[in-house]
């Protein structure tokens, strides 16, 4: 099965299934000498981990990462970095009664029709547990980006019809919804609790911002920065829409409103007075903040009775029991951050190959 790797120079390959022995990843192309230890990876995995609050799946996994290769004496060696997380709390018997049924909203049917065989335990490879490898690889990408001053922050912008009205970055990790608006976060928790009681689930929007991105990243024509960001985000389970900058809002603007005037800043750098473009023009970063929004569907695993068919086309009624997220949003945040970091790290290294010498501005 192809399609398990992402990136050109900084390349991530993930492996493993939800109820298999382990999940993990291999990162290839990371330069030698980057300071890195297990704590750097574990910090991000803990933010993605199941069972961390009442608004996430109650599956109990420590998600403790082991680095198997590519790091020596606290620094990367330049060789492939392989990391593993062992699954310790898979309960496959929860799926015994529905293993031959096609769960609505899941990949059961499409995997069956493509491969003729599938791992029915917790979704197998199509499970969101696969994203552990993305977050682990993204943690390394973030360390690399930090060497040039790039920082990334993500948060829950909207749950159903509840949207953050205040942006307080310090508030994001203070509440279990990872929402920058404390008042709206409390309402979101109440709404999730209600959905869980009603055996239902909720979707919403996560926003991710990258700051300090140097201008010049991106590879026209088919590897435009926004194209790779779109591919990265759409590859995340449950994502049904992606916007960059003003996104679909540009359809309501005139050119005179949407254009961002260029200016020369006091430090001599070139910038814009507004950021409708979301930090990317012509597929190349401008140096402004990169702003990405992801629309996530409500989790498909709900305990309500649902009509479907089995592998033979016979009508059946199923109830998906077990331990599932009533909303993916809080745990989606670190995954989305990781994918943006992977794209930017890859393009940072690609840019260093693009010219004999490179700086943010070259007048020579």
UniProtKB/Swiss-Prot annotation:
Listed Pfam families: Chorismate_synt
Highest taxon of the lineage: Bacteria
EC number of this enzyme: 4.2.3.5
Keyword Lyase: yes
HAMAP family: Chorismate_synth
Family, similarity comment: Belongs to the chorismate synthase family.
Protein name as it appears in the record: Chorismate synthase
Species for this entry: Chloroflexus aggregans (strain MD-66 / DSM 9485)
Gene expressing this chain: aroC
């Amino acid at each position: 099965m192809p399609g398990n790797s992402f990136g050109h120079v900084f390349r991530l390959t993930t492996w493993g299934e939800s109820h298999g022995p382990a999940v993990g990843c291999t990162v290839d192309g990371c330069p030698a000498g980057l300071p890195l230890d297990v704590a750097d990876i574990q910090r991000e995995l803990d933010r993605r981990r199941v069972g961390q609050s009442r608004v996430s799946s109650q599956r109990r996994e420590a998600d403790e990462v082991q680095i198997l290769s590519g790091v020596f004496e606290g620094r990367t060696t330049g060789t492939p970095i392989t990391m593993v997380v062992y699954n310790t709390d898979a309960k496959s018997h929860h799926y015994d009664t529905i293993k031959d049924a096609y769960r609505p909203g899941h990949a059961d049917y499409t995997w069956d029709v493509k491969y003729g065989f599938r791992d029915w335990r917790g979704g197998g490879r199509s499970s969101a547990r696969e994203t552990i490898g993305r977050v682990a690889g993204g943690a390394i990408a973030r360390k690399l980006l930090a060497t040039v001053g790039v920082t990334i922050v993500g948060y829950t912008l909207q749950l159903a019809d509840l949207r953050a009205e205040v942006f307080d970055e310090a508030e994001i990790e203070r509440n279990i919804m990872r929402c920058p608006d404390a008042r709206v976060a409390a309402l979101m928790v109440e709404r999730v609790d209600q959905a869980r009681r009603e055996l239902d689930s909720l979707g919403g929007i996560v926003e991710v911002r990258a700051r300090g991105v140097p201008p010049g990243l991106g590879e026209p024509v088919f590897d435009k920065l926004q194209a790779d960001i779109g591919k990265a985000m759409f590859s995340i389970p449950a994502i049904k829409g992606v916007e960059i900058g003003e996104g679909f809002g540009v359809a309501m603007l005139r050119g005179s409103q949407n254009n961002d005037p260029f200016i020369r800043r006091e430090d001599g750098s070139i910038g814009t007075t507004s950021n409708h473009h979301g930090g990317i023009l012509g597929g190349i970063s401008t140096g402004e903040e990169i702003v990405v929004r992801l629309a996530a569907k409500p989790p498909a695993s709900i305990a309500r009775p649902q009509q479907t068919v089995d592998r033979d086309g016979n009508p059946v009624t199923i109830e998906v029991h077990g331990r599932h997220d009533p909303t993916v949003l809080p745990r989606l945040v670190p995954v989305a951050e990781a994918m943006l970091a992977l794209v930017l790290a890859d393009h940072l290294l690609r840019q260093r190959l693009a010219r004999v010498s490179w700086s943010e501005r070259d007048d020579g």
